[in-house]
């Protein structure tokens, strides 16, 4: 299982306020960071992997404690052995980036009640969870461009020599677990900031899960590009391995 986290700072606008129920719409901007096999060993180095995240949201509040939210977000995940402090992982020399689209349906519970018209106590704290579907597509940079890794079967997925390794799907499910804070700027506008890990059910966010595929067999079934990108360990002179005819 791999995890990614979203840090969102957003503006919320309330187009309709009723006595007990109301709707809100919002636009979010923030950052995303990945945690997995290609994460750095030093925690502080994770900041080097933060990438932009954007989202739009619509929520229905049943009362000042409970709401449901539908959101769509787009963000990038990235990992790189080059920033790892462990020499054996630098030697491994793997990296990836992935553009991710997520749609999520979540329930929200407000620990501090949320009332956008309550200006004397404008802060609300909430927790949220639900289910998210996302589409990812890990790619690696090689020979001047980015290449999608899933079709290359870099760990032998789908090859005759690895019948137990099935190709992973690019559409996946995640469980968000969110802690957030809202601040009422006015009765119709609020700001919020939230921290939201997503727990996934795939080990291939980064195209890395198990062991290297056997090079010659991979080359025969998937070609030279797959052969090069499956094993990028650095040679003694500091250059990545390259396999050519």
Where does each model-flagged region fall?
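Transmembrane beta-strands of outer-membrane beta-barrel pores
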Residues: 29-35, 72-78, 111, 131-137, ...
């Amino acid at each position: 299982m791999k995890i990614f986290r979203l840090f969102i700072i957003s503006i919320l606008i309330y187009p309709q306020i009723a006595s007990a129920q109301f709707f809100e719409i919002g636009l979010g901007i923030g950052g995303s960071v990945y945690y997995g096999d290609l994460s750095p060993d030093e925690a502080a180095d994770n900041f080097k992997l933060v990438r932009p995240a954007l989202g739009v949201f619509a929520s229905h509040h049943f009362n000042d404690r409970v709401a449901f939210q539908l959101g769509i977000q787009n963000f990038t995940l990235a990992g790189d052995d080059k920033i790892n402090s462990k020499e054996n992982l630098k030697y491994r020399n793997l990296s990836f980036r992935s553009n991710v689209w997520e749609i999520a349906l979540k329930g929200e519970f407000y620990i501090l009640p949320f009332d956008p018209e309550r200006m004397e106590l404008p802060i609300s704290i909430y927790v949220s969870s639900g289910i998210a579907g996302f589409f990812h597509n890990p790619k690696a940079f090689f020979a001047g461009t980015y290449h999608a890794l899933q079709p290359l079967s870099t760990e032998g997925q789908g090859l005759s020599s690895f019948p137990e390794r099935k190709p992973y799907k690019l559409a996946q499910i995640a469980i968000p677990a969110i802690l957030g804070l809202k601040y009422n700027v006015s009765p119709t506008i609020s700001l919020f900031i939230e921290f939201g890990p997503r727990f996934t059910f795939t080990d291939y966010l980064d195209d890395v899960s198990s062991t290297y595929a056997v090079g010659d067999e991979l080359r025969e079934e998937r070609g030279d590009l797959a052969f090069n990108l499956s094993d990028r360990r650095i040679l003694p002179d500091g250059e990545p391995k390259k396999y050519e005819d």
